[in-house]
């Protein structure tokens, strides 16, 4: 077994640390936390929505389906697009969609409006996640595991 110092090869662990932008990673982490907490709000208020709109379990399932379809199906498409054409402003745009969905949910008077609100929150998630992943990777300084955690 050869000691790395004998071969003259010294791994540059400090170089990666110096290039890691912890302030950007912190901002992305806080934004991601807020984004995911807001999305979880929909699940948490199912009992309130059921009581307010006299929803059946099927209708509650439709709320989940609407959110999941927009969040899951749009995200890879948006990711493909932003890989080729980075959109740094998509982070606040994604959060704006999520905010719009939550605000619409707060004033919803009919079930279709609740579905639209869920779709807006899902769209916000699908826009936010690809770009936040890209920004975290760029700020990682080569420490991709750290950036994604």
Which positions does each model-derived feature cover?
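Juxtamembrane helix-start elements in MFS-like secondary transporters
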Residues: 56-64
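Short hydrophobic/alpha-helical segments at membrane-entry points of transmembrane helices
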Residues: 28, 110-118
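Conserved MFS/SLC helix-loop-helix module at the cytosolic interface between two early adjacent transmembrane helices
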Residues: 72-112
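Short hydrophobic/small-residue motifs within alpha-helical transmembrane segments
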Residues: 68-69
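Cytoplasmic helix-loop-helix junction between adjacent transmembrane helices
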Residues: 117-149
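Cytosolic juxtamembrane N-terminal segment immediately preceding the first transmembrane helix
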Residues: 2-31, 35-36
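Hydrophobic positions within alpha-helical transmembrane segments
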Residues: 31, 63-64, 117, 147
């Amino acid at each position: 077994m050869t000691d790395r110092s004998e071969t003259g090869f010294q791994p540059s662990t400090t170089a990666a640390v110096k290039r890691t932008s912890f302030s950007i990673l912190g901002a992305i982490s806080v934004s991601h936390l807020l984004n995911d907490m807001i999305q979880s709000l929909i699940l948490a208020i199912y009992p309130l929505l059921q009581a307010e709109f006299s929803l059946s379990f099927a209708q509650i399932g439709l709320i989940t389906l609407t959110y999941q379809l927009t969040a899951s199906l749009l995200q890879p498409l948006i990711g493909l697009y932003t890989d080729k054409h980075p959109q740094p402003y998509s982070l606040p745009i994604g959060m704006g969609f999520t905010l719009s969905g939550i605000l619409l949910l707060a004033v919803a008077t009919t079930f279709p409006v609740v579905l639209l609100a869920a779709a807006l929150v899902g769209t916000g998630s699908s826009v936010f996640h690809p770009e936040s992943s890209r920004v975290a990777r760029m700020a990682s300084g080569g420490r991709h595991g750290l950036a994604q955690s």
